[in-house]
Amino acid sequence: MGQIKDILTTLLPLVVLFLIFYFLIVRPQRQQQKKHKEMIESLTKGDKIVTQGGLIVEVLKAEANFFSVKLNDDTTAKLSKNYVAFKLDELDQFGLAEPIVIQQGREEISAKLSGAKTLKQRQITTE
């Protein structure tokens, strides 16, 4: 009976640490990977995506392991499905698809993440 208690008191902290590790790191990562895979499988012609390299491209055709994408009016390329970062529409959920204007003194730097014309500009003042 005493040996079983010793084994339980030794293993219990390890089991608790494993459970904490699983629920805080492994499980959320698997859920995120599952959502990303579903997003990649749902991409169709005309969807705009952002690559892991930061390029904003439009999907022309989905193939087995690649997407045929349009970089601009004249340039098409093939993109591995492994290098899709996210769908551009996902930014709209967080309000990040609006043009961003950064003011530093007298200089203005504007960046536009999507081509929509009816978006409001955000003012971010840095000092």
Curated annotation (Swiss-Prot):
Its main location: membrane. Signal peptide: none annotated. It comes from Helicobacter pylori (strain ATCC 700392 / 26695). Part of the SecDF-YidC-YajC translocase complex. The SecDF-YidC-YajC translocase forms a supercomplex with SecYEG, called the holo-translocon (HTL). One of its GO terms (cellular component) is plasma membrane. GO terms for biological process: protein transport. The SecYEG-SecDF-YajC-YidC holo-translocon (HTL) protein secretase/insertase is a supercomplex required for protein secretion, insertion of proteins into membranes, and assembly of membrane protein complexes. While the SecYEG complex is essential for assembly of a number of proteins and complexes, the SecDF-YajC-YidC subcomplex facilitates these functions. This is Sec translocon accessory complex subunit YajC. Belongs to the YajC family. The lineage of its organism: Bacteria, Pseudomonadati, Campylobacterota, Epsilonproteobacteria, Campylobacterales. The chain crosses the membrane at residues 6-26. Keywords: Cell inner membrane, Cell membrane, Membrane, Protein transport, Translocation, Transmembrane, Transmembrane helix, Transport. It is found in: Cell inner membrane. It is a single-pass membrane protein.
